[in-house]
Amino acid sequence: MRRLIGVVVLAGVALAGAGWLLTAPKPLPEGSLDGATGDAERGQLVFTAAGCASCHHAPDAEGEARLVLSGGQRFASAFGTFLAPNISPDPAQGIGDWSLDDFASAVKRGVSPEGQHLYPAFPYTAYARMEDGDLVDLWAYMQTLPASDTPSQPHEVGFPFNIRRGVGAWKMLYASPDWVMTEAESPQLERGRYLVEALAHCGECHTPRDALGGLDRSAWLTGAPNPNGRGTIPGLTPDKLSWGADEIAYYLSSGFTPEYDSAGGHMVEVVENFAALPDEDRAAVAAYIKALPEGGHLD
């Protein structure tokens, strides 16, 4: 009996050790972007498409103040409330002392410079598809923004979701850099896929999630409950959205729908971001949306 107990204990220790190793944070290889030089002007377009300011400016900031990425906005979810951190170039309170490698690992792998998992309220599962050139350009642009010494506030997340190592297990289930739309049959559709699935991370809001908070890729962009508990976020598949491509592109530039309604909530800033992009990008997003199948079954 004692031998059996010993075997069980050893097996448990081995399994725990294996789990600990498998869920460890996995940053990008150090120096993987050595020699890369960013273009801040191009980076501004990436910054806009990715909606960085929309989440990281101070609550109620307007105009140029939205370029001060001091954080503080609150994002409610079923797992707790996440507070956007300061990502301004301030070296003490922001990310001013980060290296390009640090930034790349946070954006594409969800790993902090301290080697901790970041919560997926930060959409690194989408940004994992970001091209390296765009990431380097984005980093160059962010260095030009004003610094803020506002301290980041802690997330309001209770047990067991406050155990960061658990995010590693979540990543094993859900963090895939693979495209949802596996085939993009034209350059326009390929660009639309890049904007929707990577930079603009549209799926983070418009796709339903399972009990663990992972995106249900089999129901891609079919709509979802609003994380704040108020209402729903509409679907974009043809069984949910009947707009034509021109109407979609116009909505992304103006915020006005064919039904004479207008964008509301966080979508207001999303529209403002898309309105600042080239016409070709809005047309590419519209082409992608029109290429979606009913029910969002792309797999």
Indicate residue ranges for each PLM-predicted region.
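Long, hydrophobic/aromatic-enriched structural stretches that serve as scaffold segments
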Residues: 93-117
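Extended surface/linker regions that mediate inter-domain or inter-protein docking
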Residues: 6-20, 125, 130-193, 208, ...
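Sequence context of c-type cytochrome heme-c attachment sites
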Residues: 27-30, 41-44, 57, 64-93, ...
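Electron-transfer interface patches adjacent to heme c in soluble/periplasmic c-type cytochromes
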Residues: 72-102, 125-135, 220-259, 270-283
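The canonical Cys-X-X-Cys-His
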Residues: 43, 49-59, 103, 138, ...
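Substrate-binding/catalytic groove segments of enzymes
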Residues: 114-116, 203, 212-213, 243-246, ...
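Electrostatic cytochrome c docking/interface patches
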Residues: 24-48, 63, 168-197
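N-terminal export/targeting leaders of redox proteins
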Residues: 1-41, 133, 294-297
